[in-house]
Amino acid sequence: AAYGSDAVGGVVNFVLNKEFTGFKSDVVVGQAQKGDNQEYKGSVTYGTDYLKGRGHLIFNAEYAVSKGVNGDGRASRREETNQIPEPGNTTKTVRATDIRSPFTTGGHIINGAGGTAANNAQIRGIKFGPGGVQSPYDYGKLSTTVGTTNGFQSGGDGFRIGTSQEIVRPLTRKNLFLRSDFKLLDHLTVFAEGSYSETMADQQNSPTTHLLTIQRGNAFLAQVAPDLVARMTALGVTSFTMNRLTLERGLTESHVNDKNRRLLVGFNAKLGEWNWETSYQWGTNDISIPITNNLILARMAVAADAVVVGGQIVPRALAANPGAVAFNPFGAGSPSQAALDYVMGTTSFAETTTQDVADTKITGNLFTLPAGPLAVAVGAQWRSLKSTTRSDATSAAAGYRLANTQPFSGDYTIIEEFAEFQIPIIKDVFLAKQVTANLAARHANYSTSGDAESWKAGMVWQLQSDLRLRASRSRDIRAPNISELFTAGTQQNSNIDDTFPGGTGLTFQGVPRVTSGNPNLKPE
């Protein structure tokens, strides 16, 4: 009731020194004890009067850089510990060290297909090194990954995922602020504010893990592992599933650029014992997040199914996919640059959110009671929000391994009225230096969901200068924000543990999870 429905997680109160005069600068340099996460920050502030003191100007600029901390910079990430299912027991877990994912940079065989179960298992656990050289895959001390595409292991040949993800993201931040107020009349002051901020951050996402179905007649397999092809033929195995970390171009990375612009104009007027303030604010946020080295799933499926045509290795489905390039998955560094160009892409995502706010409020004292003046604040506010998201065609078709943000557009308006009363009840008596009651009410009308009311009733008992008791009861609402209402959907990959009795006990990696908005949400 006191702060409004947009006060979702509490209100950050700050005081702007509107009368600052002079010059101030700050420089901060630091780093973590480990010698990383270097931080550099500098700011300047200037304030001055003009036109014989009727006007005042304040300017501030800030620039900050944080180098961040990568996961491989800490032993806790290099030797990550976690709970994994006890091998052979789906109801118990053990705490294991050196946790790794079963995916490898050159790939290894999960299981065969087409033959008997026993024959399929005979080609399991073959790892491909540089040039396609075969060696046994080391499943580590403890493993839930044998013969499955999911799970974790302790030690062995798996990939330490924790080393590839930042503990602290690298960040660059720029801020500019300008404010001026001018006294037109003795009881009338106009003011204007403008601000600009830009934040740039790079984030390393999860490594590019993926599964491939390799046919026995794969052209690259025949080149690098003819003995394996012969063995598969003898066993009646027609294909196998292998996993792979495609890191030839590095990790999948998000490059965030977040810009905010804000303008505010308004006036303060003194009407006898009453204060009246009215303002209009416009703000916009532009955020773009290109994601580089993002795997295009359908293209990888086409590229990995390679055959020989006219003496050249090409995708089997080349006729249906002009421009496709065959991908050699056997061993780190084996794919050609042309193949990487074909299966990797850059996700394009941009969002613009605009907000307009008109606000007016009057504060003052209605009359004086024996314990002091009865203070009141009444006002109204109009807010309009609009958001538009744009993405590339592949994302819109959910074609990438990560993100796949869907384009959307949505808007809504809110009209609110509020009133608050501060009522002095007792003053300067035994055990009561002051007792004050507080009443507040707010009505909001949402263009998406209709009316909502909130209220608050409270009391403050000031026993003495150093002891205060406070009690309150309120009806509060939490309104959905514009993303929760209109977001079309964003896909992320998660790990899901099967902890149900009688379940597999495995951790399933890379499970797609879609988060989307709901226009039918109402304030709660």
Regions found by a protein language model. Give the residues of each.
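Residue-level signature of outer-membrane beta-barrel architecture
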Residues: 48-50, 180-182, 265, 269-271, ...
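Carboxylate/His-rich catalytic cores and anion/metal-binding grooves
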Residues: 364-403
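Hydrophobic, lipid-facing positions within transmembrane beta-strands of outer-membrane proteins
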Residues: 10, 21, 40-44, 174-178, ...
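Surface-exposed beta-strand-turn/loop segments characteristic
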Residues: 1-259, 263, 270-271, 275-277, ...
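Transmembrane beta-strands of outer-membrane beta-barrel proteins
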Residues: 23-25, 57-59, 190-192, 274-278, ...
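Structural signature of Gram-negative outer-membrane beta-barrels, strongest in the C-terminal barrel
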Residues: 283-285, 290-305, 405-497, 514, ...
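Flexible glycine/proline-rich, aromatic-decorated loop/lid segments
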Residues: 15-20, 487-508
